[in-house]
C-alpha cells in the first residue's frame, strides 16, 4: 500500500492524531510495525482492525508513548497529537493534554473499590475536589451499573463492569481522545453492544474522539466513521466504515462470509493464504 500524501494545512488542522509512516522495534531486533500511517479527525471514531498479532496494540502504545516499558521504540516516522510530537512527551503529559489509553484486559486495580478505581483516573488533575466530584457523577450517569457497585471491590465485579470501570476511569481525566484497546474481548454480546453505545454517546455528547483497536470487525465498523486494517504490521486497507463493511474481501476474510453464505474456519484460512493483498 502506498504511503498517503501529506495533508494540506486545512486538513492538518482538522486532525487530532496523525501517525506518519512509523516503524516500531522491540528489543532492538524485532520489527513489529512497518510503516504504519493513520489519522483520527477531531470528533471522529476510527477503527483499527486486524487479527491477533497484527500490530493494533503496539500502534496504540506507540501513540500513548508506553512502548518503553516493554522495551519498544519508534525508530522511524512521527506521531502528532493535537499538533505536538508524542515522542517529546511523557505518558502523564499526554494524559494532561487529553490523550489516554484504556488498556486491553481492563487492568482495574483489583483490591480497590469501583469508586476508588474511578478516582485514580483524576490523578493528573489540579482543578479541585468539587470538579472531580462533578465528573464522578457524570461517569455514573453514563454507567449506572457502576453507581450501584461503587463500593464493591473491583476484582469481584463482572468483566463488563470492569470494562465500564476502565472507560469511566479514563473519563475522569477529562480526555479529548481515548485509545480503546479490544473493548469487546471476553464479553457477552449484549454487554459489548451496551459499551459501544456508550462510546457513541461520549462521541456525540462530549465530543470525545476514539481510536478503537478491535477484532470484532462487524461491531467496530457499525460504530466507526473510518477504519484501517492491519496485517503483519502494515496497513493493507483503509476507508469509510460503510465501504469497508460492504467490501467483499473484508467480509470474506474477517467475517467468514461469501455472499450470504457463512464459510468454515478451514475455508477462511485457505482464503487468507491465497489473498495477495495481505502479503
Predicted region positions:
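ABC ATPase NBD Q-loop/coupling interface
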Residues: 66-67, 78-96, 124
Amino acid at each position: 500500500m502506498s504511503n498517503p500524501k501529506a495533508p494540506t494545512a486545512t486538513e492538518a488542522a482538522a486532525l487530532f492524531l496523525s501517525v506518519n509512516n512509523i516503524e516500531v522495534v522491540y528489543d532492538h531486533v524485532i520489527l513489529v510495525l512497518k510503516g504504519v500511517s493513520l489519522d483520527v479527525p477531531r470528533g471522529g471514531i476510527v477503527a483499527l482492525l486486524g487479527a491477533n498479532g497484527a500490530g493494533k496494540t503496539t500502534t496504540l502504545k506507540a501513540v500513548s508513548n508506553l512502548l518503553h516499558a516493554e522495551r519498544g521504540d519508534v525508530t522511524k516516522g512521527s506521531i502528532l497529537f493535537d499538533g505536538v510530537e508524542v515522542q517529546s512527551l511523557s505518558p502523564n503529559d499526554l494524559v494532561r493534554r487529553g490523550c489516554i489509553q484504556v488498556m486491553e484486559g481492563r487492568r482495574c486495580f483489583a483490591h480497590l473499590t469501583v469508586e476508588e478505581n474511578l478516582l485514580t483516573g483524576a490523578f493528573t488533575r489540579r482543578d479541585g475536589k468539587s470538579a472531580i466530584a462533578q465528573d464522578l457523577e457524570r461517569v455514573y450517569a453514563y454507567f449506572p451499573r457502576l453507581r450501584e457497585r461503587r463500593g464493591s471491590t473491583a476484582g469481584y465485579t463482572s468483566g463488563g463492569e470492569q470494562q465500564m470501570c476502565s472507560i469511566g476511569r479514563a473519563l475522569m481525566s477529562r480526555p479529548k481522545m481515548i485509545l480503546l484497546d479490544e473493548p469487546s474481548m471476553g464479553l457477552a454480546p449484549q454487554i459489548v453492544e451496551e459499551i459501544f453505545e456508550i462510546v457513541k454517546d461520549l462521541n456525540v455528547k462530549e465530543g470525545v474522539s476514539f481510536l478503537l483497536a478491535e477484532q470484532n470487525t462487524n461491531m467496530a465498523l457499525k460504530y466507526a466513521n473510518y477504519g484501517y486494517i492491519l496485517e503483519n504490521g502494515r496497513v493493507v486497507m483503509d476507508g469509510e466504515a460503510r465501504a469497508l463493511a460492504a467490501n467483499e474481501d473484508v467480509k470474506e476474510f474477517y467475517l467468514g462470509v461469501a455472499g450470504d453464505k457463512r464459510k468454515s474456519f478451514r475455508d477462511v484460512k485457505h482464503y487468507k493464504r491465497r489473498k495477495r493483498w495481505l502479503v
